């Protein structure tokens, strides 16, 4: 089998295509959640706390010196990213919970036990014959 043909079969397998679609949708969803947190949730939260913009929270570790920029730790951006993570994790949790609920509905009734094999039928007949002989004696 040629390398290209083998790669094409691999790439067109359902799981790989599903994974690619999931990654693309996940990236787009991440942008939406980031915008939701940065533009919708954090401004009112900052206003409730006292007009604070979380993006501005930072600690300067070293001031700028000449052409060397300052070393700054932006922990406000980190707080915003934590909110992003919590919202994404909650959305994924809810999606999985919904999928599990739908899968439970699709579960089939327990399958009927399989028919006895030829050996089991034969052994049952022998057992019944032996019982019959013992009852006659």
Swiss-Prot record:
Q: Where is the protein localized?
A: Cell inner membrane
Give TM regions: 10-30, 76-96
Q: One Pfam family, please name it.
A: MscL
Q: Give the bilayer topology.
A: Multi-pass membrane protein
InterPro entries xrefs? Mechanosensitive_channel_CS, MS_channel, MSC/AndL, MscL_channel
Going by the UniProt record, its keywords in alphabetical order are: Cell inner membrane, Cell membrane, Ion channel, Ion transport, Membrane, Transmembrane, Transmembrane helix, Transport
Entry's Gene Ontology molecular function annotations: mechanosensitive monoatomic ion channel activity
Per the record, its GO cellular-component terms are: plasma membrane
Q: Which HAMAP family match?
A: MscL
Oligomer status and interactors:
Homopentamer.
> Per its database record, what is this protein's job?
Channel that opens in response to stretch forces in the membrane lipid bilayer. May participate in the regulation of osmotic pressure changes within the cell.
Give the family, as the similarity comment puts it. Belongs to the MscL family.
Its name, as the record gives it, is Large-conductance mechanosensitive channel
Q: Which organism is it from?
A: Klebsiella pneumoniae subsp. pneumoniae (strain ATCC 700721 / MGH 78578)
């Amino acid at each position: 089998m040629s390398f290209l043909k083998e790669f094409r079969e691999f790439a067109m397998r359902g799981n790989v295509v599903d994974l690619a679609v999931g990654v693309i949708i996940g990236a787009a969803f991440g942008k939406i959640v980031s915008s939701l947190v940065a533009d919708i949730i954090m401004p009112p939260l900052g206003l409730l706390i006292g007009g604070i913009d979380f993006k501005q929270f930072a600690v300067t570790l070293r001031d700028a010196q000449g052409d060397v920029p300052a070393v700054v730790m932006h922990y406000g951006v980190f707080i915003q990213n934590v909110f992003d993570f919590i919202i994404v994790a909650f959305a994924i949790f809810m999606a999985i919970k919904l999928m599990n609920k739908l899968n439970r509905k699709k579960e089939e009734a327990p399958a009927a036990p399989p028919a006895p094999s030829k050996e089991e039928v034969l052994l049952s007949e022998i057992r019944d014959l032996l019982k019959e002989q013992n009852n006659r004696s």
